[in-house]
């Protein structure tokens, strides 16, 4: 009987200790300073899965914050409103597949941590073979994206001859416009567009050229959090060197050479 009582007592003690340890970890995590991170629904970088945020940027941010001693708090933003959310203090930084190129003086940057390509996609049987063939055609892009900025600013000569740019709120709508034949081509981030085109093997084709290659960074308000940005840059570099970033990219099916090191021209 005594042995039974002792076993029960030890079991209860173990449960109490385990609960105490769990509570301690929970308390320690909550005591960490928060880093409020603004993202945008943009698979495979930032999206919702079973009511939780996930994606490449989310995993990179979570690991970087763990190493730096911060607790990440993710907030979903519209692409068009992300700059406003940062400037008014709603978020501490933008970690949302954000292109650094052309914006170097607009923010305090951490990174670059990845590279990206903006590409042209057409139906497999389309006669379009180059950007020049888009003259007089209809092209879909996402509102607030780098692709839309390039179109509005007239930076790419071939795009100046496009007849109509159809601008949609989400990348899913950009793709559906092409699938339903409303437009002749779509332009966007290669990694994000593949989420859609790979659902229909052999039906879509990427033109053998890039619209633009650019660097991705984490944006803080201009002139603020410079030490934090520098620390984050160092942490992201360490994650590249120890293979963490490559492992995350492979998990989401992206080419490591292209996305981590910029590929080749």
Model-derived segments and spans:
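Short, low-complexity disordered leader/linker segments with a strong preference
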Residues: 1-34, 265
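Ligand-binding clefts/hinges and TM-proximal coupling segments of bilobed small-molecule sensing domains
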Residues: 18-26, 146-168, 205-206, 237-265
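Extended ligand-binding regions for polar small-molecule ligands
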Residues: 22, 58-67, 125-128, 132-146, ...
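Extracytoplasmic small-molecule ligand-binding "clamshell" domains
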Residues: 26-97, 167, 231, 251
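Bilobed "Venus flytrap"/periplasmic-binding protein-like clamshell domains
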Residues: 36, 40-44, 53-63, 98, ...
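Periplasmic-binding protein-like
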Residues: 40-41, 115-122, 190, 194-237, ...
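Acidic, polar ligand-binding/catalytic clefts
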Residues: 62, 66, 71-133, 205-210
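A ligand-binding cleft/hinge motif common to bilobed small-molecule-binding domains
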Residues: 81-84, 96-106, 150-153, 177-213
């Amino acid at each position: 009987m005594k042995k039974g009582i002792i076993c029960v007592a030890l079991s209860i003690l173990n449960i109490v200790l385990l609960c105490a340890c769990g509570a301690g970890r929970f308390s320690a995590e909550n005591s960490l300073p928060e880093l409020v991170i603004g993202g945008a629904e943009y698979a495979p970088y930032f999206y919702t899965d079973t009511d939780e945020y996930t994606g490449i940027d989310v995993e990179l941010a979570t690991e970087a914050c763990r190493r730096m001693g911060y607790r990440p708090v993710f907030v979903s933003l519209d692409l068009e409103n992300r700059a406003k959310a940062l400037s008014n203090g709603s978020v501490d930084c933008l970690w949302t597949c954000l292109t650094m190129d052309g914006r170097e003086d607009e923010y305090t940057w951490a990174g670059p941590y990845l590279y990206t390509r903006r590409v042209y996609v057409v139906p497999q049987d389309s006669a379009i073979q180059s950007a020049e063939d888009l003259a007089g055609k209809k092209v879909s892009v996402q509102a607030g994206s780098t692709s839309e900025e390039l179109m509005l600013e007239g930076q790419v000569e071939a795009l100046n001859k496009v007849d109509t740019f159809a601008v949609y709120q989400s990348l899913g709508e950009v793709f559906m416009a092409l699938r339903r034949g409303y437009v002749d081509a779509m332009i966007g981030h290669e990694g994000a567009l593949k989420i859609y085109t790979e659902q229909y093997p052999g039906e879509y084709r990427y033109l053998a050229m890039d619209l633009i290659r650019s660097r991705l960074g984490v944006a803080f308000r201009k002139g603020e959090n410079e030490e934090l940005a520098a620390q984050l840059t160092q942490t992201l570099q360490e994650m590249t060197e120890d293979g963490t970033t490559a492992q995350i990219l492979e998990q989401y099916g992206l080419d490591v050479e292209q996305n981590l090191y910029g590929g080749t021209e």
